Amino acid sequence: MKKVTFLFLLFAWLMCGGCTNQTDMGYVPVSGEGKIYYEEKGEGEPLILLHGHSLDTRMWDLQFDEFARHYRTIRMDFRGYGRSSKQTETFQFTHLDDLLAVMDYLKIEKAHIVGLSMGSFVAGDMVAMAPERMLSCVMASGGIRSVQGPSEPMGAEESARRDKEIAELKAKGIDVYKREWLETLISDGGSRREEMRKPLWQMIDDWDAWQPLHKEVRMFWAREAWKRLEETCPSVPTLMLRGDSKGEGKPYSPKELKYLPNGTALLLPDCGHMMNMEQPETFNRAVLQFLDGIK
């Protein structure tokens, strides 16, 4: 009887992947009665994946399971994207504030942060504004933005310019805009760029395109983050990645590294902006080797 019970328990354990292969998901309450959707898998040090503009958690499909073999891996939809709450033109928030709220809710004191494109803007904000919450930082296809931050609200001239841009976009049609945006992301790629077309379009097609059709609040610390970075020179281990789709091998020396003493930069061959989707094996290896090197 004991043997039968043991075998049953062993079978159940294997069927649930040792109880570590399950993906937990849920919502985190954030400011302004908002909520952030997240998924979590794996054990170990926390690692959080931050997606790009017009995309969502699915852009990390080729990283999520792999990283979860080594880390407690979390991916989340930013406010205004995927299954998270919508944005408004009036409520001021930053994506960094939402990220920190997710970490607090999940009882994560520090995490490895991996962001691509818009996600790298948030990762850059964090390394400057909240380095004490980071184990490491990976910024791919981007870095800290050089635009107005929350302390510089939109003025009349910028508001009028946005009115004109929004009217032009509505006249063009959002479907045309989405198709053009898709081609922009794909045309930047290397030899495997067409492999991204279907998964990229699935996300872009599902996206409600609220952002280009409205006047967004300042969601990035941006210039304020640059000022803080230059003042503090945080010691967070940092990796900055850029794709080299043309094989030109041009030097990559992002300005951020001047103020990040434990930072390094790396070119990834045969890929463009969406490097994690285009060359997932190369991207995963670069990130995991970087993380292994700082343990």
Could you tell me what each predicted segment is?
Residues 34-83:
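Conserved HGGG/HGGXW glycine-rich cap/lid loop of the alpha/beta-hydrolase fold
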Residues 41, 65, 75-118, 285:
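Active-site loop/oxyanion-hole signature of alpha/beta-hydrolase fold enzymes
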Residues 232-271:
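Conserved loop-alpha-helix segment in the C-terminal half of the alpha/beta-hydrolase fold
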Residues 263-295:
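Catalytic active-site module of serine/aspartate enzymes centered on a nucleophile-bearing elbow/loop
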